[in-house]
């Protein structure tokens, strides 16, 4: 059987049309930034936008769906960045073809339709295909062998090959618990001339057998013990990589040889002045322009954190590869126009935002080019001596001074067979962070020269203390006196002020004598046992040797103690609820709240948070005494006291018992757990790979938080005219009504535009044998413009048509030319003629093109000129 050649555009359309004919609703691609999953950095599969449906928290007006989803894998768990350009199939950005069943059809239809599409529509040779099933999934195996007719030797059972029950390449789980089930993957055999073995064999990682389609059957619900039970409404989730399928259908072995990439690679070669179209750097650039442009379209701007930093890394990696090819001036942003030509029809948002995308990438490119050449000189110099490892401090300098992301430096070094000292890089990074933290403190701590005796901390028992001034500092320099209006540092021989340590902030308060009043804004350690009180002398004069009264701010200290004590209880509760793997990774305790970072690899569920709150508040209600004891480190260990991994402890430590918690701690705490009053979690999220952060409030702040929530609920109830207890149902009903109205509105717009289209056909003017029509459709969107265009072309037979829609100042344009007329008039030329007059530009195919503009006032004149323009060209 000869396999026909399909373009990427053909593959998309054929896939969607096939499943639409099978009763599936065609759903648009969701943005690369997930709207329903804050735990996920980027959309990395087609099912992401349906996750809430699978979890039962959302219901759609359809039970069958199909989509072509834009995806990104760069950063976090799914990171293909370093492989892009060097393999045949790795991408940062890719498109995923998918179809879904939400409690409707199941394995039989899913597998049979997949086989039908691949062999009867795409015309793939059946003898080139094989499938895998989960070893225990006899149903799928029988469908393949007995109903579809795939020979048993080409249906491979894959068992638990990942070290545990249900841990298998052919058993899919959404998370550690919840919906899961077996999957069946379809592979394409490229032939014996390609190295590699079938799936499940020792040589399965070769390139001969390539997975093209995965059919996931979510039929079970897994509990925390790993037991599964059937779901009441099994679902289907399938995914097929568009680029992989295109390579097969276009008879090439690499994804980078398909038509879409061929065009982008040639564009990259044009902009970099390169003639070798096989150069891996061109593949990198072609891949990265897709990723970065779509990220900008979805609102991700290059920055130094989060998604923005991933965007910056991708942009700068592309720029570096252009630089490697000899391009020493900005070029990358110029590829946006080529990308729009290739993908603008399928994804109108990149055409609509073409100017903005280009501008964002241009600014980032210009910024990096300012330092790129100098950074490369430093890198070249460091590697000139034949060293096999780039020092970590050099890698950090490139990162810190010249904007080289570490993976970019790794990229350069990998090409030269050189390793990067990443541990040294991490050390330099931490040193900079420590320096930055220190610079953010008041200029008073370890930079101050103090040679006197240690001070005595009395703040565990006293909040007011008579003390003597033993040192004063202004602007970091020792002084004998401090005068009114001056800011400085006061050191006392004894102090009730707690100096920042162990995550607890330093105390505030006052130091005074007679008319002199010094307001303490912060307390920091000058040495381990010497505390510096930073602040401002509001009145009078303070001298070294003066006897003063030191008074801690009672309200702030009490609130801070509540939050510190509850942190211990929360730490214990976290370990009880989540497991003993929970370890403290950082904390901040002040008067407003407690912030606690801990090791855990998954978001906390609402039920887990509620259980943590229950456990902690039970300890609060028990109102047990807090007990602190000093003992040697060995004795403390024997008591079972919690010690923080990586923390350095002295020979004598302070063991704190609060409720059922026992930890080593030098902080200040409440006398009884009941003093905490109330505990409420207010936030939970991820801060790094494997690290979560939880924030909570206590006492008056917890009460204020709950009162604020209550006020919000009351306002919402008043707005919806419903009692608070009925809010959830009322909101759900309102959302359902909105969805229904939106659907009805879309249908009405379509009908209105369609009826306008029927009327407009009579307005067409014959120009030298071609019916010419230029008109505005009220209330139409891009989809309606295209649909109306198709109807008018069918009706007018031989025609050149321009349709426009207006939304505020924005103009959307569609141009269409019938097949028998494209030799005389091109839709792209026609749409750009009109677009240029309304402040825009566009493009497309000879028979259909789209454009946008920003000057709606100029539209009537532009449309009026179409007839003359067509007449001149034919």
UniProtKB/Swiss-Prot annotation:
**Quick one: which residues bind Zn(2+)?**
564, 568, 665, 669
Specify the superkingdom: Bacteria
- Stated EC number for the protein is 6.1.1.7
Q: Which InterPro entries match?
A: aa-tRNA-synth_II/BPL/LPL, Ala-tRNA-lgiase_IIc, Ala-tRNA-ligase_IIc_anticod-bd, Ala-tRNA-synth_IIc_core, Ala-tRNA-synth_IIc_N, Ala-tRNA_ligase, Ala_tRNA_ligase_euk/bac, DHHA1_dom
List locations, semicolon-separated. Answer: Cytoplasm
Cellular component terms per the entry's GO annotation: cytosol
Identify the Pfam families for this entry: DHHA1, tRNA-synt_2c, tRNA_SAD
- Its predominant location is cytoplasm
HAMAP family assigned to the protein according to its UniProt record, in alphabetical order: Ala_tRNA_synth_B (MF_00036_B)
Q: What does this protein do?
A: Catalyzes the attachment of alanine to tRNA(Ala) in a two-step reaction: alanine is first activated by ATP to form Ala-AMP and then transferred to the acceptor end of tRNA(Ala). Also edits incorrectly charged Ser-tRNA(Ala) and Gly-tRNA(Ala) via its editing domain.
Name it. Answer: Alanine--tRNA ligase
Its taxonomic path starts at:
Bacteria, Pseudomonadati, Pseudomonadota, Betaproteobacteria, Burkholderiales
The encoding gene: alaS
């Amino acid at each position: 059987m000869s396999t026909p050649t399909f373009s990427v555009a053909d593959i998309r359309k054929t896939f969607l049309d096939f499943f639409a004919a099978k009763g599936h609703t065609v759903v648009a691609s969701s943005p690369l930034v997930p709207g329903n999953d804050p735990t996920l950095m980027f959309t990395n599969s087609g099912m992401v936008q349906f996750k809430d449906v699978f979890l039962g928290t959302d219901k759609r007006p359809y039970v069958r769906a199909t989509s072509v989803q834009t995806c990104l894998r760069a950063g976090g768990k799914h990171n293909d960045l370093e492989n892009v350009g060097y393999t045949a199939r790795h991408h940062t950005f890719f498109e995923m073809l998918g179809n879904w069943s939400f409690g409707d059809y199941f394995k039989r239809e899913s597998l049979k339709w997949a086989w039908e599409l691949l062999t009867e529509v795409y015309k793939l040779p059946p003898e080139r295909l094989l499938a895998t099933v989960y070893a225990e999934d006899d149903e799928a195996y029988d469908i393949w062998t007995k109903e579809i007719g795939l020979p048993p030797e080409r249906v491979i059972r894959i068992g638990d090959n990942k070290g545990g029950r249900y841990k298998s390449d052919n058993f899919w789980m959404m998370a550690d618990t919840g919906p899961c089930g077996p999957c069946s993957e379809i592979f394409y055999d490229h032939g014996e001339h390609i190295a590699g073995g079938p799936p499940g064999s020792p040589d399965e990682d070769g390139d001969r057998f390539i997975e093209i389609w995965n059919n996931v059957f979510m039929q079970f619900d897994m509990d925390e013990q790993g037991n599964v039970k059937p779901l009441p409404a099994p679902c289907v989730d399938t995914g097929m990589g568009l680029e992989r399928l295109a390579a097969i259908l276009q008879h090439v072995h690499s994804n980078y040889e398909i038509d879409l990439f061929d065009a982008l690679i040639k564009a990259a070669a044009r902009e970099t002045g390169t003639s070798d179209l096989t150069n891996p750097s061109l593949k990198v650039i072609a891949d990265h322009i897709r990723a970065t442009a779509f990220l900008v379209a979805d609102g991700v701007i290059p920055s130094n954190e989060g998604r923005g930093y991933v965007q910056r890394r991708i942009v700068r990696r592309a720029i570096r590869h252009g630089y490697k090819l000899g391009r020493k001036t900005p070029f990358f942003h110029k590829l946006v126009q080529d990308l729009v030509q290739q993908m603008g029809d399928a994804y109108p948002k990149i055409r609509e935002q073409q100017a903005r995308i280009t501008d964002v990438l241009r600014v980032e490119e210009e910024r990096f080019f300012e330092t790129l050449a100098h950074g490369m000189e430093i890198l070249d110099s460091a590697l000139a001596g034949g060293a096999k490892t780039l020092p970590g401090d050099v890698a950090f300098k490139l990162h810190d001074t010249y904007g080289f992301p570490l993976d970019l430096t790794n990229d350069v070094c990998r090409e030269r067979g050189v390793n990067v000292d990443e541990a040294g890089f991490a050390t330099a990074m931490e040193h900079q962070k420590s320096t930055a933290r220190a610079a953010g403190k008041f200029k008073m701590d370890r930079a101050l020269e103090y040679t006197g005796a240690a001070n005595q901390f009395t703040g565990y028992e006293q909040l007011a203390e008579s003390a003597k001034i033993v040192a004063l500092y202004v602007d970091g320099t020792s002084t004998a006196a401090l005068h009114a209006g001056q800011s400085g540092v006061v050191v006392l021989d004894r102090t009730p002020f707690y100096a920042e340590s162990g995550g607890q902030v330093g105390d505030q308060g006052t130091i005074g004598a007679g008319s002199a009043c010094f307001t303490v804004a912060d307390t920091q350690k000058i040495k381990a046992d010497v505390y510096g009180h930073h602040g401002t002398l509001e009145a009078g004069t303070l001298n070294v040797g003066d006897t003063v009264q030191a008074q801690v701010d009672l309200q702030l200290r009490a609130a801070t103690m509540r939050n510190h004590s509850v942190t211990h209880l929360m730490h214990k509760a976290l370990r009880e609820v989540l497991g003993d793997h929970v370890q403290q990774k950082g904390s901040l305790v002040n008067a407003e709240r407690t912030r606690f970072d801990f090791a855990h690899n998954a978001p906390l569920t609402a039920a887990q948070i509620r259980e943590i709150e229950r456990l902690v508040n039970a300890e609060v209600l028990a109102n047990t005494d807090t007990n602190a004891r000093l003992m040697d480190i060995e004795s403390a260990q024997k008591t079972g006291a919690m010690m923080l991994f990586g923390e350095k402890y002295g020979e004598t430590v302070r063991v704190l018992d609060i409720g059922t918690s026992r930890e080593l701690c030098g902080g200040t705490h409440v006398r009884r757990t009941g003093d905490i009053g109330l505990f409420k979690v207010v936030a939970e999220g991820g801060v790094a790979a494997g690290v979560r952060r939880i924030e909570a409030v206590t006492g008056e702040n917890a009460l204020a938080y709950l009162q604020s929530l209550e006020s919000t609920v009351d306002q919402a109830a008043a707005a919806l005219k419903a009692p608070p207890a009925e809010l959830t149902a009322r909101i759900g009903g309102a959302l359902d009504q909105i969805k229904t109205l939106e659907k009805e509105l879309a249908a009405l717009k379509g009908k209105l535009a369609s009826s306008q289209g029927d009327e407009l056909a009579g307005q067409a003017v014959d120009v030298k044998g071609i019916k010419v029509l230029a008109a505005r459709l009220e209330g139409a969107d891009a989809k309606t413009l295209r649909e109306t265009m198709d109807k008018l072309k069918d009706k007018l037979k031989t025609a050149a048509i321009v349709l426009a829609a207006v939304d505020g100042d924005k103009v959307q344009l569609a141009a269409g030319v019938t097949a028998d007329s494209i030799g005389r008039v091109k839709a792209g030329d026609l749409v750009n003629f009109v677009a240029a007059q309304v402040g825009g530009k566009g493009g497309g195919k000879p028979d259909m093109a789209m454009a946008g503009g920003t000057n709606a006032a100029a539209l009537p004149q532009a449309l009026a000129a179409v007839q003359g323009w067509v007449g001149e060209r034919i």
